[in-house]
Amino acid sequence: MYRKPSRQMTLDDFSLPFSGSLSTDNRWVRLARIIPWDQIEKEYAFLFPSDRGNVATPVRMALGSLIIQAKCSYSDRETVQQITENPYLQYFIGLREYQVQKPFTPVAMVKFRKRFNSKRMAQVNELILKAEADQQPVAALIDEEKHPTNNHDDDDTNKPSGTSTAGTELTQQEEPAKPNQGTLILDATCTPADVRFPTDVGLLNEAREKLDEMIDILHQGLGKQEKRPRTYREIARKRYLTLSKQRSPKGKQIRKAVKQQLQYAKRNLRIVEQLLDKSSKQTQPSGLNQRYMKLLSTIRTLISQQTAMYQTRSHRIQDRIVNLHQPHVRPIVRGKAGAAVEFGAKVAISLENGYSRIEKLSWDPFNEAATLVDTIERYRQRHGYYPEAIMADRIYRNRDNLAYCKKHGIRMSGPRLGRPIANMAIKKAEKRLEQQDARERNAVEGKFGEGKRKYSLSRIMARLKETAECVIAMQFFVMNLEHKLRVLFVQILSMLFRRQNTAVLAEI
């Protein structure tokens, strides 16, 4: 059940002890002003259609706590602790007065991330970008009212007498398509998950240890009616350490160790299945909990994949598991000097006027060039026209994308196809244009750098698939909020300078 607050609180509604007051210049107060809480609440209330049960957490508290965590890179416990100690953070999440009690437990942060998944965060992000787009025509209209021009007449004397409503509708229907406007910058990156660098021997050893834990639990649940099955855990551990302590083991040694750990893991898996069968036949079954059953399913898949790769002497397989606790994580080949392979989600984004949108988020590798057409079509749906130019990497310049851009009159950055131009003047002009495009495309590289250095895009700490996607989407959402604050500051500053110049000219 969701209960909507009577109205969204303002700064004057928040009460402090000892007759204090909050500063209007605080960063959290300014940030709370630019977020459309009422519009987000309308979408959030649909998650709770029932009118029974406990009252859900308000949207400002749920989303606000996630924004605080993403902006400051806090853990769940630290986020709750900071909110408890800071009155500005309590105002930001919608509390009416300062309180010393914790507004919620750290476990609630996981529920908040599940509610605001990547699709819902994309909708919230669009509300912010739409509000910014709506402010630009208003600002232009205000400037036009302050500085009117004489290029148009307000009287109707010059209008033809034969006009009608039907004629107006016909004129609107026959209006030609709008010319291409704007610049769209595209790029993709990998957001690494918080996983250890995987090796075949290490994964099999970890699977063997987890199966040993399951055997202990199942054997204890059976009441120790029989002797515990032999698993050779000490010998298996010793053989694993023999290889892992070597600096550069040879290929034959690695293959031998994989075979040994694979045999130990298969033996433990057979024992677990036998104990599960015995446990199900009891009057009071005492099997594994949901977490262990999910882990057991992942281990089965891992053993199957490792067996197939060992038999075929290959190191590649589809949907390869690289972590037992995060089976959705896949290896992403980047081919860069720092990290040839990263393990996490791949994100393709578009940058428009400094604001970023997630065009595609996938845990499986994909070619970002395939997202160009859909990205341009979504741009056209938002604005009613195609972009004038596309700034993208060379991987986007395949034949299909170039033909699509040529068909719709869109210029794509990069060198032209075909033979080099003999005319030196044209060649120099194209070279200058390529350099200018490269400078403009640096904005998206800076956006990735901002997310990975200032925020937590360089390591996603969330372990569940849906919560990790929420964390990734939240990082770009917070960066858009920060950019909006910077744009708002520049607009206010330019307005002050304009008024000052107007006053000086009036005195002259």
Question: Each predicted region: which residue ranges?
Answer:
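Acidic, metal-coordinating catalytic cores used for nucleic-acid/nucleotide bond scission
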Residues: R52-T57, P87, M391-R399, G418-P420
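Charged, often Cys/His-bearing segments associated with DNA-binding zinc-finger transcription factors
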Residues: M1-I35, K42, A139, N151-S164, ...
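Basic, short loop/linker segments at the boundary and entry of helix-turn-helix/winged-helix-like folds
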Residues: L22-I67, C72
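Electropositive, glycine- and tryptophan-enriched low-complexity nucleic-acid-binding patches
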Residues: K336-H383
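Flexible, glycine/threonine-enriched loop-and-boundary segments that flank and lead into catalytic domains
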Residues: N323-G338
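Basic, amphipathic alpha-helical segments enriched in Lys/Arg and hydrophobic/aromatic residues
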Residues: Y292-T298, I303-Y310, R432-I508
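Short, conserved catalytic/metal-binding motifs centered on acidic residues
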Residues: N26, S65, T79-I83, T105-F112, ...
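Active-site- or DNA-interface-adjacent structural scaffold in DNA-acting proteins
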Residues: R96-Q326
